[in-house]
């Protein structure tokens, strides 16, 4: 049974990665998002939607499961349990990255949660379930949720629920928050950081600080793509977190890369670098990105329609005749990432209202990230993607 469960979880993680890549492709194809830097947390969205599926019935549940990519809802819960208890556990006391993650279910006092949903939320998702008063104290509840998220993300995400987004018609808010701060295994010497040109999608350029290093780096190069792996210091932690920079050789190749990642499920894994190589030149820009979106339309583009419609069925969530009137009205998502000489700080929050062989690379290579690129942060043992995004101009913070 343990072996079967492990196999099921590994399969679910592969589906989570596919979900992440489909999201990235959809964001990159949006003209507004493609023209600016973007970052999002696939795991934050995935866990929030999985918890939503736990309270959904019939066709609504089936559509959530299909969108998230697993064959059955139990696979979502098994994955969420592994993610929450293993992948996103804090490792700072062992010398590894500081990771903080929390789930919350805030339900109006007029709608008691079903015991089965509450037990699943608490045991599998480690969610804090709270009965609140949306009808007469909606603004206070919004402040409570925002303060909770701000605390978990060490102040990086302050207002996951925008002003006026919660009112006396709100019945339920599912929210989660994620924070990550890790130091590179091989930190960059800040004295080597110098301004250089970064070429923008429109052909113009800006001067921005580039980090550099003489150390050998994990790098692969094939199919018109270079992939850089930057491991984080782990200390005594058994997990291995890494950031990946996916640099298309063509300066305008970002959207094509995102499409290829989405269309070919094994494309990313095929290009993960397995060995260090000597670099003749190595330049990576520092960047800091804040990104927020109301993600309903994004999820609808992935085929998730029923939870937002009048046909939504959340009868497994609340013990009330009003359950059949519940639907998702908003999905607020915010993310933050900063990459500098020391390492990476990243945070995200979602609120739902309602071993392969590789050809050996050339002995000496260059890696100069002087045009738009994709990046992702993942835990390598499990393959879970925590953050993903793209940089089109390192000088832009949002």
UniProtKB/Swiss-Prot annotation:
Top-rank taxon, per record: Eukaryota
GO molecular function annotation: serine-type endopeptidase inhibitor activity
Pfam families: Serpin (PF00079)
Keywords: Protease inhibitor, Serine protease inhibitor
Cited InterPro entries: Serpin_CS (IPR023795), Serpin_dom (IPR023796), Serpin_fam (IPR000215), Serpin_sf (IPR036186), Serpin_sf_1 (IPR042178), Serpin_sf_2 (IPR042185)
Protein task: Inhibits chymotrypsin and cathepsin G in vitro.
Domain comment as written in the entry: The reactive center loop (RCL) extends out from the body of the protein and directs binding to the target protease. The protease cleaves the serpin at the reactive site within the RCL, establishing a covalent linkage between the carboxyl group of the serpin reactive site and the serine hydroxyl of the protease. The resulting inactive serpin-protease complex is highly stable.
Similarity comment: Belongs to the serpin family.
Protein name: Serpin-Z1C
């Amino acid at each position: 049974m343990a072996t079967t469960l492990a196999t099921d979880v590994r399969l679910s993680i592969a589906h989570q990665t596919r979900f992440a890549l489909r999201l990235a492709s959809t964001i990159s194809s949006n003209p507004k998002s493609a023209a600016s830097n973007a970052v999002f947390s696939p795991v934050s969205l995935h866990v929030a939607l999985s918890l939503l599926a736990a309270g959904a019935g019939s066709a609504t549940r089936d559509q959530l499961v299909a969108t998230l990519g697993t064959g059955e809802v139990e696979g979502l819960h098994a994955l969420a349990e592994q993610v929450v208890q293993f992948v996103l556990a804090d490792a700072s006391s062992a010398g590894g990255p500081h990771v903080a993650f929390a789930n919350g279910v805030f339900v109006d006092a007029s709608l008691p949660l079903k015991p089965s949903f509450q037990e699943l939320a608490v045991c599998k998702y480690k969610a804090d379930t709270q009965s609140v008063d949306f009808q007469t104290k909606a603004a206070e509840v919004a402040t409570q949720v925002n303060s909770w998220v701000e605390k978990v993300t060490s102040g990086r995400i302050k207002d996951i629920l925008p002003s006026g987004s919660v009112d006396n018609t709100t019945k339920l808010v599912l929210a989660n928050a994620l924070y990550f701060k890790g130091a590179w295994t091989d930190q960059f010497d800040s004295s080597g950081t110098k301004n250089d040109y970064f070429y923008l999608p429109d052909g113009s350029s800006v001067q921005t600080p580039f980090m550099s290093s003489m150390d050998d780096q994990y790098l692969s190069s094939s199919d018109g793509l270079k992939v850089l792996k930057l491991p984080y210091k782990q200390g005594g932690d058994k997990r291995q977190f890494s950031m990946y920079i996916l640099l298309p050789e063509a300066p305008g190749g970002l959207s094509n890369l995102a499409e290829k990642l989405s269309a070919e499920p094994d494309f990313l894994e095929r290009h993960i670098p397995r060995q260090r190589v000597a670099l003749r030149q190595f330049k990576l820009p520092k960047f800091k990105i804040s990104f927020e979106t109301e993600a309903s339309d994004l999820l609808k583009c992935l085929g998730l329609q029923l939870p937002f419609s009048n046909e939504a069925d959340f009868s497994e969530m609340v013990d009330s005749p009003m359950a059949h009137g519940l639907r998702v009205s908003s999905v607020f998502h915010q993310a933050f990432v900063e990459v500098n000489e020391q390492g990476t700080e990243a945070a995200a929050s979602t609120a739902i209202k309602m071993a392969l062989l590789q050809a050996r690379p050339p002995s000496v290579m260059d890696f100069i990230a002087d045009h738009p690129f994709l990046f992702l942060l993942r835990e390598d043992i499990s393959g879970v993607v925590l953050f993903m995004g793209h940089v089109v101009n390192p000088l832009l913070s949002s």
